[in-house]
Regions:
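Core beta-strand elements of the Rossmann-like FAD/NAD(P) dinucleotide-binding domain
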Residues: 2-3, 280-289, 293
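Mid-to-C-terminal "cap/lid" subdomains and adjacent gly/pro-rich loops that border
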Residues: 35, 47-84, 289-296, 300-400, ...
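Conserved redox-cofactor binding core of oxidoreductases
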Residues: 55, 62-84, 98-100, 104, ...
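A glycine-rich dinucleotide-binding beta-alpha-beta segment and adjacent secondary-structure elements
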Residues: 90-92, 221-232, 256, 261-265, ...
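Conserved beta-strand-loop-beta-strand element in the redox core of flavoprotein oxidoreductases
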Residues: 262-284
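C-terminal catalytic lobe of FAD-dependent flavoproteins
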Residues: 376-458
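A conserved FAD-binding loop/helix module that cradles the flavin
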Residues: 511-529
Length: 536
């Protein structure tokens, strides 16, 4: 069959691109391993504390039947993934092989991609950020609104954080309730905003792709059960799979269980060569247009391999990320309400120390349903004492994670290695920050920690989960490639050297702002899909 378009990838970008193409009456196929786990659907629709008291099957989703929810040692990328979410990357080492000594990304093989476990925070990029990314001429405002309409966003129009994080989206749901811990922090900040403002920081409720009101008959308002890291929670958190499942069968085909290996642009059609992950059978699918939404790292793998550019280096962008567990003194000895959601409660930005731009973007989580053992294993204390301390501090623990901007340098790149016909090429990653970048990040971390202390949230550590730990990847097929001019994105988001291959994810970006990229990935995918429709 000759499809109008094939979308490779089912994640944050792929879901939105497929939706826009199908809505335009195109016949669309999606190629993706699309592995899924229904463990999340076995979790009773009850509050976390009640499940801990009464559910005899809680082991299966809290720590896993094979203890897979207990990391063996250290902090690794994806450590926050609970057993019901670990299918996201299960088997990726075989399906998406890589080599590195410096960069160990989370590579998804699941239905929904990384969107099957994302944090749901949604931010808009401003004109200066879009300019640096290579999207200076793009008006994303209507696409941001369309993405919000499709995903379901809850936002507080009066939040101080909006000035840098949320502009131009008029329609959204009311804000979510925040938990007791966050309320105490926000109350202290609002009593004297100058404490943070003089340090170049803002703080407030942030937009979240979590429903505060029912969306339709399937996706319902978040019940504040504090089980969001485990179950589907009435589908209240947007996942790409929920959107994909609504696409009409007469115009959309999910070619699940397939691993795209390479493509060929023949001028009047594109051939997508894939392998069935279970049977090993090779297949070729045909379409007039191809939209790469495999995620920046895998889109680059496919494109380099398909163009025969073995050994050619291309940039990597990835937000550096640090999180700081803190003790909120206002909550010591206080009880916290049980009714809360598990995701980020508050957030804000940290301005550049030498300009007015945003250098860091942070979110605050309470430490409740992720279980104390994950905290105890990071404490420099004997386990019994660590447990006692953790129980004492539990309601007062506030985890602040901060992301920093990233830009191209000579020491951040990937390349594909030679491979036999019909095999997935190995990607070699190398990601090393320059001394200047490291120094700047440390200065901003110190100022950030000072701001937290002014809120009476005292850091008890600083954790670096690794150079791929933010799980924010972009910039691998940039508009401007400093490594090799042959491998880049054209201004219309087609892949250089092809006529019918479009880049629908974050691979073309020249720069990665500190703000979470997922909401802009959604909007950009809708924009690129519109171009595909216009060319069809």
């Amino acid at each position: 069959m000759l499809y109008d378009a094939i979308v490779i990838g089912s994640g944050i970008s792929g879901g939105m691109a497929a939706k826009a193409l199908v809505d335009a009456r195109l016949h669309v196929a999606m190629v993706d391993p699309a592995r899924d786990s229904r463990l999340r659907d076995r979790i009773p629709d009850k509050p976390f504390r009640e499940l801990r008291r009464t559910d005899a099957d809680q082991r299966s989703y809290l720590i896993g039947d094979h203890l897979e929810g207990i990391p063996a040692a250290g902090v690794k990328v994806g450590a926050q993934l609970t057993p019901p979410r670990q299918h996201i990357s299960r088997g990726a080492d075989d399906l998406l092989p890589s080599q590195s000594e410096t960069f160990f990304p989370l590579l998804p093989v699941s239905l929904g991609g990384l969107g099957a476990g994302w944090g749901a925070a949604c931010f808009t990029f401003d004109a200066s950020e879009l300019q640096r990314m290579g999207l200076g001429g793009a008006d994303l405002a209507p696409y941001y609104q369309r993405a919000a309409d499709l995903a379901g966003i809850s936002a507080d129009p009066g939040s101080e954080a909006n000035g840098r994080l949320w502009q131009g989206v008029g329609r959204h749901q009311p804000p979510l309730r925040i938990d007791t811990n966050a309320e105490s922090i926000l109350t202290r900040h609002l009593g004297d905003p100058s404490r943070l403002n003089q340090r170049g920081m803002t703080l407030g409720r942030i937009p979240m792709a979590i429903l505060s009101e029912d969306f339709d008959q399937t996706r319902r308002a978040n019940p504040y059960f504090d089980t969001d890291f485990y179950g589907s929670v009435r589908q209240s958190i947007y996942r790409p799979a929920y959107l994909i499942e609504t696409l009409p069968a007469d115009r959309f085909t999910l070619l699940g269980g397939r691993l795209a290996l390479r493509f060929e642009d023949k001028g009047d059609e594109v051939l997508v060569h894939s392998r069935h992950v279970e049977t090993g059978v090779f297949e070729t699918h045909r379409a007039r247009r191809l939209v790469l939404c495999a995620g920046a790292l895998n889109s680059a793998r496919l494109a380099l391999h398909s163009l025969g550019l073995v050994g050619v280096k291309t940039p990597i962008l990835c937000n550096p990320y640090t999180y700081m567990p803190t003790v909120n003194l206002a909550m010591l000895g206080r009880e916290a309400r049980d009714d809360c959601h598990s995701m980020a409660q508050l957030g804000g930005v940290l301005r550049h120390d030498d300009s007015d731009g945003v250098y860091g973007c942070y979110q605050m989580y309470s430490y409740r349903s992720l279980l104390l053992f994950k905290l105890i294993k990071e404490m420099p204390l004997p386990p019994a004492l660590g447990l006692l301390v953790a129980r004492t501090l539990q309601t007062s623990l506030a985890i602040f994670g901060i992301f920093f901007e990233d830009q191209q340098t000579d020491s951040k790149h990937l390349e594909v290695l030679p491979v036999a016909e019909g095999q997935m090429p190995v990607v070699r990653f190398d990601y090393r920050q320059t001394d200047s970048e490291i120094g700047r990040q440390r200065r901003h971390e110190d100022r950030f920690a000072s701001g937290l202390r002014s809120l009476r949230c005292f850091p008890i550590g600083k954790v670096d989960p690794g150079k791929a730990g933010s799980i924010h990847y972009a910039g691998t097929i940039p508009f401007e490639n400093p490594f090799d001019k042959r491998f880049h994105a054209n201004p219309d988001c087609t892949l250089a050297g092809t006529r019918n291959v479009y880049l629908g994810d974050g691979a073309p970006w020249n720069f990665l702002p500190a703000k979470g990229l997922s909401f802009t990935l959604m909007a950009n995918a809708l924009r690129v899909a519109e171009r595909v429709v216009a060319a069809s």
